[in-house]
């Protein structure tokens, strides 16, 4: 007896179901799911895999996304606790990690996340040996280093989301002050993601017009317009959002999808992302910090050599020293 499907559809060939543009998100917390929905809305993948250790939550999130399939162009959404669901991924995004407990030292948090990465990274590598790794978990610069060490991948394929979001926040706030869309406001925040990030005042421009040339006090303590406040707001904004809603999710999700788009579509756009910076700016240790990187199908193919002031360079070096101080204590 022919089934309804057999009566309706005449099959012409047995197809190999190997995905061509698969993306995996590890960790289905608020950040992981914001990354997932942002990627789905951009039609970047032909398959999306979700992985987590909490199976009920994982299945629920997968089903919820699958039920939106009519409105999406990603034909396959899968999930599992077992990493075999991640096989043949082009890009693997890591958002999983321990949350900082009240009063917990940064070093202690890092070590807890290292232990989590010691489980995640080898499993990812086993099933997708040629993937690019995009690290989002905090502290992102240190954990990108950890992922690089554990994976054994070449440095071009291990990328930290880094200052992509810090720079986006910076450009948004710049735009608010000037009444111009952030896309037309150019400015870069580099270095360590978070508190010790470095705004490059000399590079701020709209339509190629340097703000520093028009307003030489820009970013200094003498500045009557207090543009330094803009960077201060960038640093404080995450803490404020966390205080108000408990976590940040949407902006980082959109930021990660922006990076994923450059990688999956081989766009060769320039992003401030965390990469191995040894040998630049007088840095002699294996540390990852954000500098402008060209992102494409091989991950980071090139860096843009930014001219920094001696003060900016010193701040970058200080961040590198702080990170190395923590990294050399880590137990792998």
From Swiss-Prot:
Residues annotated as the enzyme's active site: 193 (proton acceptor)
Glycyl lysine isopeptide (Lys-Gly) (interchain with G-Cter in SUMO2) cross-link site: 57
Binding-site positions, NAD(+): 29-57, 99, 138
Alphabetically ordered keywords of this record: Acetylation, Cytoplasm, Disease variant, Glycogen storage disease, Isopeptide bond, NAD, Oxidoreductase, Phosphoprotein, Ubl conjugation
Phosphotyrosine carried by residues: 10, 239
PTM annotation (Phosphothreonine): residues: 18, 309, 322
Residues the record lists as N-acetylalanine modifications: 2
Organs and tissues of expression: Predominantly expressed in anaerobic tissues such as skeletal muscle and liver.
InterPro entries hit by this protein: L-lactate/malate_DH, L-lactate_DH, L-lactate_DH_AS, Lactate/malate_DH_C, Lactate/malate_DH_N, Lactate_DH/Glyco_Ohase_4_C, NAD(P)-bd_dom_sf
Documented activity regulation: Fermentation of pyruvate to lactate is inhibited when bound to folliculin FLCN, perhaps partly by FLCN preventing binding of cofactor NADH.
Pathways involved: Fermentation; pyruvate fermentation to lactate; (S)-lactate from pyruvate: step 1/1
Catalytic reaction list: (S)-lactate + NAD(+) = pyruvate + NADH + H(+)
List of residues that carry Phosphoserine: 310
Example of a GO cellular component annotation carried by this entry: nucleus
Residues bearing PTM N6-acetyllysine: 5, 14, 57, 81, 118, 126, 224, 232, 243, 318
Annotated effect of mutating residue 99 to A: Abolishes interaction with MP31
Alphabetized Pfam families for the sequence: Ldh_1_C, Ldh_1_N
Quaternary structure note: Homotetramer. Interacts with PTEN upstream reading frame protein MP31. Interacts with folliculin FLCN; the interaction is direct and inhibits enzymatic activity.
Function: Interconverts simultaneously and stereospecifically pyruvate and lactate with concomitant interconversion of NADH and NAD(+).
Protein name: L-lactate dehydrogenase A chain
Organism: Homo sapiens (Human)
């Amino acid at each position: 007896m022919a089934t309804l499907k057999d009566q309706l559809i005449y099959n012409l060939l047995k197809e190999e179901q190997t995905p061509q543009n698969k993306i995996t998100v590890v960790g289905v917390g608020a950040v992981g799911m914001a990354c997932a929905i942002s990627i789905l809305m951009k039609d970047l993948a032909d398959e999306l895999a979700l992985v987590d250790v909490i199976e009920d939550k994982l299945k629920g999130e997968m089903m919820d996304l699958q039920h939106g399939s009519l409105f999406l162009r990603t034909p396959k959404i899968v999930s599992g606790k077992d990493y075999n669901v991640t096989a043949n991924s082009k890009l693997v995004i890591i958002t999983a990690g321990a949350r900082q407990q009240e009063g917990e030292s940064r070093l202690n948090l890092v070590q807890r996340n290292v232990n989590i990465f010691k489980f995640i990274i080898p499993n990812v590598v086993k099933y997708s040996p040629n993937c690019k790794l995009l690290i989002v978990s905090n502290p992102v610069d240190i954990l990108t280093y950890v992922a690089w060490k554990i994976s054994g991948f070449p440095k071009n394929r291990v990328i930290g989301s880094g200052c992509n979001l810090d720079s986006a926040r910076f450009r948004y706030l710049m735009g608010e002050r000037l009444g111009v869309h952030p896309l037309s406001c150019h400015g870069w925040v580099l270095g360590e993601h978070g508190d010790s990030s470095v705004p490059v005042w000399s590079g701020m421009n709209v339509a190629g017009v340097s703000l520093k040339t028009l307003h030489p006090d820009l970013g200094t303590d003498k500045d009557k317009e207090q543009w330094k406040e803009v960077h201060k707001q960038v640093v404080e904004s995450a803490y404020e959002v966390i205080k108000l809603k408990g976590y940040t999710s949407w902006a980082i999700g959109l930021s990660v999808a922006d990076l994923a788009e450059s990688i999956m579509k081989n766009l060769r756009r320039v992003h401030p992302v965390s990469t191995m910076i040894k040998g630049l700016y007088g840095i002699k240790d294996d540390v990852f910090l954000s500098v402008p990187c060209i992102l494409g199908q091989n991950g980071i193919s090139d860096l843009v050599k930014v001219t920094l002031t001696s003060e900016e360079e010193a701040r970058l070096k200080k961040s590198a020293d702080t990170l190395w101080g923590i990294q050399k204590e880590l137990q792998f």
